Amino acid sequence: MVSIRPDEISAILKQQIEDYDKSVSVSNVGSVLTVGDGIARVYGLQQAMAGELLEFEDGTEGIALNLEDDNVGAVLMGEGLGIQEGSTVKATGKIASVPVGEAMLGRVVNSLGRAIDGKGEIATSETRLIESMAPGIIQRKSVHEPMQTGITAIDAMIPVGRGQRELIIGDRQTGKTAIAIDTILNQKDQDMICVYVAVGQKAASVANVVEVLRERGALDYSVIVAANASEPAALQYLAPYTGASIAEYFMYKGKATLVIYDDLSKQAAAYRQMSLLLRRPPGREAYPGDVFYCHSRLLERAAKLSDAMGKGSMTALPIIETQAGDVSAYIPTNVISITDGQIFLSSDLFNSGLRPAINVGISVSRVGGAAQTKAIKKIAGTLKLELAQFAELAAFSQFASDLDASTQQQLERGKRLRELLKQPQFSPLILAEQVAIVYAGVKGLIDAVPVDKVVDFSRELREYLKSNKPEFITEIQEKKLMSPEAEAILKDAISEVVSTLVASAA
């Protein structure tokens, strides 16, 4: 017979009472009705908030987007292969946020800020909401500092300032990403943090960009956010907001930042896919009604902050891909109306050998003029007009048999100006080099150089200035002004290089 020991029973009871936890946890739990195509319908989440993070039974995360009478429509931020009908879903009470901090520099992350470059976890202590409010009017300052891209055609004719939103738009394979990467490379030693967001691209293309930045020492001040083509639509939709949040962290610390969204057409397509699967009513081109708001709330986060806010800035270079040069389609017109100007790349110019293939006639920078450095502003004033007139005359001259001398001269100069602005990929130029090249073309100092030698002239002039006239480069780089002395040095250098080239051509 088992003997009952009262002291043992009382000891167990005391232990149980001591260990008793009075805290009551309340969780908002529902169950999956249907799942498929990256969308889950959940029943029972009565208290769910719009945009709230949901946690599924298999660990997959989702975002509540549609709050309906009897169910919640959620998008999955993962494959969700372990989610079944009837499995439980828990509302976390949190909005999606990403880790931010200095440790992100040099890393490749996904849309949730998790490392995907095989270098281990990123040690950050701070997080930031993926969706956050854009700075208000009082917190901003007008754009007044230049953001040099290193591409002569842009810095001379379509200048971009820190805090500006400048759209890069064009057909596929016209060099849109090349301009963005060159801009990142040109920020070396400029104390600027760059964030490159790749949306819906091939993993090989992203790996190529990372390798280019690493080889040229630009990865040290850059963060890559990648949502590849194979990833769920929800992650492709979130990637630009993640990039903006990472850049915002540095902006509010007083740093200058640059964010490239490559490209927002694919983000809009991902958002359209999600919206249609959630049974939201389609609008023009089957995009949902709030696709404009989707882009405007992202691009409004770019700003030049006031002195009281720390003087930081976020410059945004969104990229949009057009179909057969149609800039009047829905998404291109939306983003053109949101941004402060656009750089239009033409496939015809690209195929004719003009790289970068910028169509000067319809490219514009609405606020960048105030930020342009005086040195280049003074000499490049007529450049855009001359090139636009040249394009018009060139089209007209195809039908005219005999042209007067002034028209002929304008055509010849236009050809040389166009050649001067050619620039190979991954070779951004410093301000002094741009000033020298544009000055030579606009002032007509290379009219004697054969058209096929203009690219050689450009290269040799830069080499001559570096080796023989370093004082010119130093003065322009430091003072950002062209003094009469510097102009005299430049004229001598140009005539020296021109005479050498003309002699060799003869």
From Swiss-Prot:
It is found in: Cellular thylakoid membrane. It catalyses: ATP + H2O + 4 H(+)(in) = ADP + phosphate + 5 H(+)(out). GO terms for cellular component: plasma membrane-derived thylakoid membrane; proton-transporting ATP synthase complex. It holds the Pfam family ATP-synt_ab. Keywords: ATP synthesis, ATP-binding, CF(1), Hydrogen ion transport, Ion transport, Membrane, Nucleotide-binding, Thylakoid, Translocase, Transport. ATP binds at residues 170-177. SUPFAM superfamilies: C-terminal domain of alpha and beta subunits of F1 ATP synthase, N-terminal domain of alpha and beta subunits of F1 ATP synthase, P-loop containing nucleoside triphosphate hydrolases. Coiled coil: none annotated. The keyword Disulfide bond does not apply. InterPro entries: ATP_synth_asu-like_sf, ATP_synth_asu_C, ATP_synth_asu_C_sf, ATP_synth_F1_a_nt-bd_dom, ATP_synth_F1_asu, ATPase_a/bsu_AS, ATPase_F1/V1/A1_a/bsu_N, ATPase_F1/V1/A1_a/bsu_N_sf. The keyword Membrane applies. Its EC number is 7.1.2.2. It comes from the Bacteria. Its main location: membrane. The record marks 363 as: Required for activity. It is a peripheral membrane protein. F-type ATPases have 2 components, CF(1) - the catalytic core - and CF(0) - the membrane proton channel. CF(1) has five subunits: alpha(3), beta(3), gamma(1), delta(1), epsilon(1). CF(0) has four main subunits: a(1), b(1), b'(1) and c(9-12). Belongs to the ATPase alpha/beta chains family. Produces ATP from ADP in the presence of a proton gradient across the membrane. The alpha chain is a regulatory subunit. This is ATP synthase subunit alpha. It comes from Parasynechococcus marenigrum (strain WH8102). The lineage of its organism: Bacteria, Bacillati, Cyanobacteriota, Cyanophyceae, Synechococcales. The gene is atpA.
